[in-house]
């Protein structure tokens, strides 16, 4: 029973104790509620720009219904009615007994004085705090490149110092250290007190600058491998030689840059040199090739000129067989030969004649026939350079009748000169020998049997209106004067030629325009000066195709008492007639002016031309002949005395000339129109 009473007493005590506590609490609460709220002091804050800043306002006693407000200056932060009063980077967090003002990124605008106010029904309390925003240090290129500063000191050897930031009134102070006393910035460095040595960690040494009273301005000298304001950051170890490293690491970069520049420059120079070498090589090769081509061209031109010269100098074509000698032309057939115009131009052939007396007025005449054409040559030089053949047609008289073309007048040209300027020719066919009586009527040359009886030479020559030895007779009539025939000598040296076939360059001489009709007795027969022809005058009319004229001598020749003149046979040019008929002809009148007319028909001349191929033109529709008559002085190369040669010498001379004509037949493929006797 006694234990139960104790328990009850204990219980009773517990109850009483609780009541006592509650009473005490009520008393305390009554006392707190009766007093106004109070706030704790806030320390001054200094924050680097860009970092987070937290300001905490806390009440001393816990009282119900406490209300906190923040002010910057006189302006409330985060007012309800003013939404713009609270910046985005500022936040306010409230609790029962405290309130926090959080600035996420401090800036220079956040620098200033802040005020915290707490209030309730009993009263209010206010606390102020100063906030300092330190700007970020401005690092120059020396700091970024870790370039060390050299400190002037008494000692020679100076240790490399580490750059540290010293915050002092928004200024960055660069400090250096050395063995012994150090000097930097506004004053000397002083080691921190024992209490402040813990500011630097990782074995760093703490220093304070003289003249700065703030306890927060410290500088740490970090050991190798650490960096930062308090040596909290690690830095890779770098070994730097103080003798050579003078804080100019840019020199290394500059040296590297120079090396690169030199390398690139060298490569460019090498490329330029190689390009120049290639250009020079190509130029040399091109020059050599051009020189070779020029040499080949000169050699080819030289060989061609040499071949042309050799070809001109050779008397015969090597493709053709050499001419046969001692060929007798008597009683032989003469083939149709073709003499090239080029050989006639290149070679000058002379035939010597001897003068003889006049024996008859009806025999021994040399006839030159002209054939006028409808077309005129473009110039004297054109007619001279044309590739027409120049030929002398030798005919033998077989009939005694005189022949005159009924279609028009006929021109005559004297073969030898008398005492006057121009002696006129005459057409005679009187001979006892008949052409048809020969054993070979088509190709037989009866004029070659005896030296005393020779056939006259018939020329096809152009006759200019200004010719000194030509006169025009009216149609249906002809004037002829007999001239003595001449004997032919095979030796050019003995007899001076009256007939000369000269190259075309000798015929390109200019002549005077004066007409010789006014002075017929003067000698105008010089080779280099012929007044009958002039370079500026019109070229001669093209000639008609000559018909076959037959002449023969029947009497012996007598020496002539008059000096003979040279007759130069100029070149003859082929002309083509569209109709092929024989038109007007001109006859030459001699000084003795004896007229004669013939009545032989034109058909008989054509028949004789067809039967005698080497005395006529094979194609009368394709060619006509043209030539110019030139004369020389009587005393130039004519022998006044007549000479007679033997039959053997005459035949040898004629055979050589005929063989040359035979050799040129295959090469030129033209009709033979000349046979030199």
Swiss-Prot record:
Q: What GO molecular function terms would the record report?
A: chemorepellent activity; growth factor activity; protein tyrosine kinase activator activity
Q: How is it modified after translation?
A: Proteolytic cleavage close to the plasma membrane on the external face leads to the release of the soluble growth factor form.
Record-annotated membrane-spanning stretches: 261-280
Q: Which cysteines are joined by disulfide bonds?
A: 57-116, 192-206, 200-220, 222-231
Keyword Cell membrane listed? The answer is: yes
Bias category Low complexity: which stretches?
351-375, 591-600
Recorded GO CC terms: extracellular space; plasma membrane
Basic residues bias spans: 13-24, 568-578
Kindly state which keywords UniProt assigns to this record, in alphabetical order.
Cell membrane, Disulfide bond, EGF-like domain, Glycoprotein, Growth factor, Immunoglobulin domain, Membrane, Secreted, Transmembrane, Transmembrane helix
Q: In which tissues is it expressed?
A: Isoform alpha1 is expressed in brain and muscle. Isoform CRD is expressed in brain and spinal cord, but at very low level in muscle.
UniProt biased composition (Basic and acidic residues): 1-12, 78-91, 294-315, 505-515
- Give any single GO term for biological process: brain development
Q: Matching Pfam families, A to Z?
A: I-set, Neuregulin
Where do glycans attach? 124, 130
- Extracellular topology: which positions? 1-260
| Region (Disordered), start-end ranges | 1-43, 78-106, 294-326, 350-375, 397-418, 457-479, 503-617
| Composition-biased stretches (Polar residues) | 397-407
User: Per the database record, which ranges form the EGF-like domain?
Assistant: 188-232
- Biological role stated in the UniProt entry: Direct ligand for the ERBB tyrosine kinase receptors. Induces expression of acetylcholine receptor in synaptic nuclei.
The similarity annotation says: Belongs to the neuregulin family.
What does the entry's domain section say?
Answer: The cytoplasmic domain may be involved in the regulation of trafficking and proteolytic processing. Regulation of the proteolytic processing involves initial intracellular domain dimerization.
Question: What is this protein called in UniProt?
Answer: Pro-neuregulin-1, membrane-bound isoform
What species is given as this protein's source? Xenopus laevis
| Lineage of origin | Eukaryota, Metazoa, Chordata, Craniata, Vertebrata
């Amino acid at each position: 029973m006694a234990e139960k009473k104790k328990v009850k007493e204990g219980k009773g005590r517990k109850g009483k104790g609780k009541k006592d506590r509650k009473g005490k609490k009520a008393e305390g609460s009554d006392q707190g509620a009766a007093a106004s709220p109070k706030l704790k002091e806030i320390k001054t804050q200094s924050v680097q720009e860009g970092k987070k800043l937290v300001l905490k306002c806390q009440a001393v006693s816990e009282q119900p219904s406490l209300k906190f407000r923040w002010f910057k200056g006189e302006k409330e932060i985060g007012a309800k009615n003013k939404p713009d009063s609270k910046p985005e980077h500022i936040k306010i967090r409230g609790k029962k007994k405290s309130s926090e003002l959080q600035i996420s990124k401090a800036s220079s605008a956040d620098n200033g004085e802040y005020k915290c106010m707490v209030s309730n029904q009993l009263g209010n309390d206010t606390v102020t705090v100063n906030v300092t925003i330190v700007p970020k240090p401005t690092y120059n290129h020396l700091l970024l490149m870790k370039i060390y500063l050299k400190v002037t000191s008494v000692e020679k050897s100076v240790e490399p110092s580490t750059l540290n930031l010293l915050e002092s009134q928004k200024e960055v102070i660069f400090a250096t250290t050395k063995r012994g006393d150090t000097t930097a910035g506004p004053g000397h460095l002083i080691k921190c007190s024992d209490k402040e040595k813990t500011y630097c960690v990782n074995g760093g040494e703490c220093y304070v600058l003289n003249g700065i009273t703030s306890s927060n301005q410290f500088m740490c000298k970090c050991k190798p491998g650490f960096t930062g304001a308090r040596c909290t950051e690690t830095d890779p170890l770098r070994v730097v030689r103080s003798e050579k490293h003078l804080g100019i690491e840019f020199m290394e970069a500059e040296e590297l840059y120079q090396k690169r520049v030199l390398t690139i420059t060298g490569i460019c120079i090498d490329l330029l040199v190689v390009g120049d070498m290639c250009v020079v090589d190509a130029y040399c090769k091109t020059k050599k090739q051009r020189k070779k081509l020029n040499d080949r061209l000169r050699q080819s031109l030289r060989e061609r000129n040499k071949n042309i010269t050799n070809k001109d100098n050779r008397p015969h074509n090597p493709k053709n067989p050499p001419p046969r000698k001692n060929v007798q032309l008597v009683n032989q057939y003469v083939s149709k030969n073709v003499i090239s115009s080029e050989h006639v131009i290149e070679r000058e052939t002379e035939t010597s004649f001897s003068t003889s007396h006049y024996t008859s007025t009806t025999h021994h005449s040399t006839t030159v026939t002209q054939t006028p054409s409808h077309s005129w040559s473009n110039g004297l030089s054109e007619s001279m350079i044309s590739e027409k053949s120049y030929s002398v047609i030798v005919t033998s008289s077989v009939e005694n009748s005189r022949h005159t073309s009924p279609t028009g007048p006929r021109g005559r040209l004297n073969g030898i000169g008398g005492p006057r300027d121009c002696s006129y020719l005459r057409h005679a066919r009187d001979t006892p020998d008949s052409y048809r009586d020969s054993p070979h009527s088509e190709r037989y040359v009866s004029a070659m049997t005896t030296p005393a009886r020779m056939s006259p030479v018939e020329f096809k020559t152009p006759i200019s209106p200004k010719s000194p030895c030509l006169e025009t007779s009216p149609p249906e009539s002809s004037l002829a004067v007999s001239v003595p025939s001449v004997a032919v000598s095979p030796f050019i040296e003995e007899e001076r030629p009256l007939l000369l076939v000269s190259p075309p360059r000798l015929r390109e001489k200019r002549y005077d325009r004066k007409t010789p009709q006014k002075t017929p007795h003067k000698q105008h027969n010089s080779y280099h000066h012929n007044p009958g022809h002039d370079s500026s005058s019109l070229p001669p009319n093209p000639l008609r195709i000559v018909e076959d004229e037959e002449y023969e001598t029947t009497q012996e020749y007598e020496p002539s008492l008059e000096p003979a003149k040279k007759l130069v046979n100029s070149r003859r040019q082929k002309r083509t007639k569209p109709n092929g008929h024989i038109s007007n002809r001109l006859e030459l009148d001699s000084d003795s002016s004896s007229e004669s007319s013939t009545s032989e028909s034109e058909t008989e001349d054509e028949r004789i031309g067809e039967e005698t191929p080497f005395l006529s033109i094979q194609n009368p529709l394709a060619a006509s002949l043209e030539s110019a008559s030139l004369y020389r002085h009587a005393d130039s190369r004519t022998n006044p005395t007549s000479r007679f040669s033997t039959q053997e010498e005459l035949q040898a001379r004629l055979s050589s000339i005929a063989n040359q004509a035979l050799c040129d037949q295959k090469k030129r493929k033209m009709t033979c129109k000349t046979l030199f006797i």
